[in-house]
Amino acid sequence: MSEVDTIAKQNITRMNKLQKRLRHEVGSAIADYNMIEDGDRVMCCLSGGKDSYTMLDILLTLQQRAPIKFEIVAVNLDQKQPGFPEHVLPAYLDKLGVAYHILEKDTYSIVKEKIPEGKTTCSLCSRLRRGTLYGFAQHIGATKIALGHHRDDIIETMFLNMFYAGKQKAMPPKLLSDDGANMVIRPLAYCREKDIEEYSTLKSFPIIPCNLCGSQENLKRGAVKDMLQMWDKQHPGRIETIFTAMQNTSPSQGVDRENFDFISLKRNPDAVNTGDVADADLPAFDFVDISNNGHINLDISNRIDVVATFKP
């Protein structure tokens, strides 16, 4: 076997392994959030980037194996960016045999007119694109709108909102539009960007660069991405832990008055004292006991003595 054949075989093996992992992660996300139901018509939004290509590819694979029946319709919005290769997506989708629609709307000119040179165009561009896609979804009777955001996007968005907007807010895997007319799903919510990138390369998807924002440096998101990548290298498993933490919130242990009713929280005068101590709260306090060099021993075995000797 030649070196070329060996490399090709290794690539196929790696691609199959990645597809299995991505298929499992997408399937888990769909099941966990009930993203796709029997009889759904899923409008798969295809931009021509690695994420949306991977999403379509994995959804088509799952469609063949799923115990339920659902339809997939690919939709691309041609925003009339200069140099956009209009033939690429139709040729790719024709080869796949997937039903698709190519929409044309000159949002590029609107964005260039409204946004000063050098400023980030992403916000306005995505808002215009979202409005068009939401409307078209209703036009074709789509019951779900699938977007290609992955786990890294979700985590980055959370930190962006924390650092720059003062909010604990990310991208939900499943979202009902404000008017209640459209249901948005993110099947790649459990998938890592580096897996998607490698899979896209191995599959040789015909990537279409975004001339409007693909080469535009979004400094804030870029800084957050760099931070997360550094953590991933220096502290393996930290990104996974962050995402797990996002799925395990406890409003009563936070400070958000909108998510938990602290105002009407009262002690029960009739409650029987069981000696229960809020373990999570103990490290936050600095109890003083002059008989123990200024500090009380909070070890569980000494907790009764601690309560007995503590004199505020």
UniProtKB/Swiss-Prot annotation:
Binding site for [4Fe-4S] cluster: 122, 125, 213
Stored Pfam families: ATP_bind_3
Entry's Gene Ontology molecular function annotations: 4 iron, 4 sulfur cluster binding; ATP binding; magnesium ion binding; sulfurtransferase activity; tRNA binding
Pathway annotation from the record: tRNA modification
Extent of motif PP-loop motif: 47-52
Class of the enzyme per the UniProt entry, highest EC level: transferase
EC number: 2.8.1.-
An individual GO BP term: tRNA thio-modification
UniProt subcellular location: Cytoplasm
Manner of cofactor binding, per the entry note: Binds 1 [4Fe-4S] cluster per subunit. The cluster is chelated by three Cys residues, the fourth Fe has a free coordination site that may bind a sulfur atom transferred from the persulfide of IscS.
Cofactor: Mg(2+); [4Fe-4S] cluster
Reaction equations catalysed: cytidine(32) in tRNA + S-sulfanyl-L-cysteinyl-[cysteine desulfurase] + AH2 + ATP = 2-thiocytidine(32) in tRNA + L-cysteinyl-[cysteine desulfurase] + A + AMP + diphosphate + H(+)
SUPFAM superfamilies cross-referenced by the UniProt entry: Adenine nucleotide alpha hydrolases-like
Entry coiled-coil feature ranges: none
GO cellular-component term (any): cytoplasm
Keywords carried by this UniProt record: 4Fe-4S, ATP-binding, Cytoplasm, Iron, Iron-sulfur, Magnesium, Metal-binding, Nucleotide-binding, RNA-binding, Transferase, tRNA processing, tRNA-binding
InterPro entries associated with the record: Rossmann-like_a/b/a_fold, TilS/TtcA_N, tRNA_Cyd_32_2_STrfase
Protein role: Catalyzes the ATP-dependent 2-thiolation of cytidine in position 32 of tRNA, to form 2-thiocytidine (s(2)C32). The sulfur atoms are provided by the cysteine/cysteine desulfurase (IscS) system.
NCBIfam families noted in UniProt: PRK10696.1
Note: The thiolation reaction likely consists of two steps: a first activation step by ATP to form an adenylated intermediate of the target base of tRNA, and a second nucleophilic substitution step of the sulfur (S) atom supplied by the hydrosulfide attached to the Fe-S cluster.
Subunit structure: Homodimer.
Protein family: Belongs to the TtcA family.
Name used for this protein in its record: tRNA-cytidine(32) 2-sulfurtransferase
Native source species: Shewanella frigidimarina (strain NCIMB 400)
Biological classification of the source: Bacteria, Pseudomonadati, Pseudomonadota, Gammaproteobacteria, Alteromonadales
Gene: ttcA
